[in-house]
């Protein structure tokens, strides 16, 4: 019986699921925009939102908490130097999930996950 079990299993073991979401968090922190399936995007919110909240206060203990989940020095560095100060005034809701159609092959619903307040890169070559 699965009473009071929250979250999805994605037909993976717990260690595989933990590694998958750790890698997805690192990719989102590095690129600030990723494309994945809709259920994974919805579950990714449970992992990335607390990480960004922890990164608002830059201390050794909070860096260690983030590294325990991410296992990537570069991702932790960007999280605390760029994203923490960027979201300092925002009380939550750090990511946006946008539905973007269905995947060819298995027709899985896809979504784009992006960080809010992402800097827009403009093309100045047109002028």
UniProtKB/Swiss-Prot annotation:
An example Gene Ontology CC term for this record: cytosolic large ribosomal subunit
GO molecular function (one): structural constituent of ribosome
UniProtKB keywords: Ribonucleoprotein, Ribosomal protein
InterPro entries: Ribosomal_bL17 (IPR000456), Ribosomal_bL17_CS (IPR047859), Ribosomal_bL17_sf (IPR036373)
A Pfam family annotated for this UniProt entry: Ribosomal_L17
GO annotation, biological process: translation
HAMAP family xrefs: Ribosomal_bL17 (MF_01368)
Family as reported in the entry's similarity comment: Belongs to the bacterial ribosomal protein bL17 family.
Subunit comment: Part of the 50S ribosomal subunit. Contacts protein L32.
This protein's name: Large ribosomal subunit protein bL17
Lineage, top ranks: Bacteria, Pseudomonadati, Pseudomonadota, Gammaproteobacteria, Legionellales
